[in-house]
Every structure is written in structure tokens, then in C-alpha cells.
Amino acid sequence: MIHLGLGQPDFKTPQHIMDAAKKAIDDGHHGYVLANGITECRQAVSRKIKSLYKKDVDPERIMIMPGGKPTMYYAIQMIGEPGAEIVHPTPGFPIYESMINYTGAKAVPYDLTKEKDLKFDPKKILSSITDKTRLVILINPNNPTGSFVEKPAIDFLAEGLKKHPHVYILSDEIYSRQIFDGKEMPTFFNYPDLQERLIVLDGWSKAYSMTGWRMGWSVWPEKLIPHVTKLAINSFSCVNAPSQFAGIAALDGPDDFVHHMMEKFDQRRKLIHKSLNDLPGVTCSMPGGAFYAFPNVSGTGMNGSEFSKKCMHE
């Protein structure tokens, strides 16, 4: 049985990244470090953002996290509360809704539909905003659908969000390096008017096959940095130093591995898309990013759970 449930690449972490961690251990980087991340690592993230998007981000606005979930949790924990509304995608990464419910806020889903090839509709998101809305969550490319929303739709959404200054934006861009067909990532760093209420989540897990290293980064509004730093200090203390030095090597090193992995994922994407659509009663949109396919099995007369069990046992 092939396990397709985990969102992790099946590639080995590149050797130069592992070597950097080993060197950090040999050099004696064994103790506590800054809760927001060692300066060199935050500077490396800032350089990478500049290289990819031509945008300057102050390293003091960057948090190094043990993966992506702390950014999700801290953002929702700080902004969500009873009486507040948080807008999120469905299908989407399921942790978001459970975190929203934990805070007592109301989860307001916006549907990703087959008519839109599972891409979010910016008009639908904007129409979901009320005076109680405190946070809009975006995942692009999307987990678990593999859909990718391009720049014109993001431009439209960003323009609409300018009219709602009471709303924060959490842009989950963890799959930003995994976009197909030569298309570019329409990052929310492109919108200067939103930076004071924008949280961007990204990291090393997907792009560099480092899921087990527990390394993520996020960029926060300056006014929230003291608060998220306190949460970091009082929860995980700091990300272990050798992993941060490995993260520096990943960001500053060659991108050959990233391109090689994407070539392989592209081959798999085309194969799984064709294979799923060849099955009677099954349709599947071509994934535009990440490494997921999200078939519609309603034509088989089964629901998703029944179809999964049938595939596993038969």
C-alpha cells in the first residue's frame, strides 16, 4: 500500500543542507538561541524574499518557527475570540478550522468549487466579510486541492481587502516554490497597502524536502512582533540551532534540487491527472501547484470515504 495521506515530498534533503547542520553541531551550536530565530537565519529569509519577489523585508519582522503550524496557531489565537469571525477555505488544511473553533471565534468557510476548478473566488471571499470579520485565511497553492490562483484574481482580492482595514490577512504560501507551467507566485508581499495587517507563512518543509526538520518562517506586521515573540518564548523557546544553520544553507545555496523535484512532480501530476480521469465516474482538474490532486468521485455513486476504501481493498 502506498501512503498518500501525508503532505511531504519523498525526496532526501539535499546533502549541502545536511552538511550545514552537521557543521553547526561540530562548531558547538548546542544551546538556546533567540526565540524569533538566529539573526543570520532571519537575514537569509529576507535575502530569499528579495531574490524571489524583489521586495525588501526587515529581518526584525521575520519569525523562525518549528514548522508552519505555530504561525497558524499564533495568528488565530491572537486575532480570534468569541464574537469574531474568521474566513477560511474549504476544502483547506483542516487544522485551520479546528484552531478557529478552539479560540471561540466563528469559522466562516468559503467553498472551492468544481465550477472554478477548486480555485478560490475573490468575490466570494470579499462577500463573506462583515464588521465581525477579523481574519481572512488564504492558501495558495492550495492544500489539499492542488489548485493555484494567478495574479489577476489576487490583485482583485487585494484591492477589495483595502476596503476592510479591520481585517487581517494570513497568506499561507508554503507551496510558493511548487507552481507548474512556468507560472510565478503572486505573493501578498506585492501589496504595500496591506503590509500592516498581513501575515505570510512559508518555510523549508516542502521546497527543500525538510518536513522532519520542523523549520518554518513567517513575516508579521511590526506591531504584532512583540506579541508573537512572547508566545514563542513561552511555548517552544526557540528552534534548534543546527536546523537553522541548515535553513541558511538551503536558502543561500543552489536551487538545482528545487527545480529537479518540480520536474519529477510535474511528471507525476500529469500521470495522476490522466489516470484519475480514465477511471469511470471520476473527474479531476489539473493541479496547478503543490503536489496534490483532488478528484471528484460523485459520478461513481460513492462518496469519498467509500471510494477510498474500495481503492484500498480492491
Where are these regions (language model features)?
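A glycine-/small-polar-enriched, mobile loop at the entrance of the PLP active site in fold-type I
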Residues: I2-D10, K23-R42
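PLP-dependent class I/II
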Residues: Q8-K23, D56-E314
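Conserved N-terminal alpha-helix of the aminotransferase class I/II PLP-enzyme fold
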Residues: Y32-P66
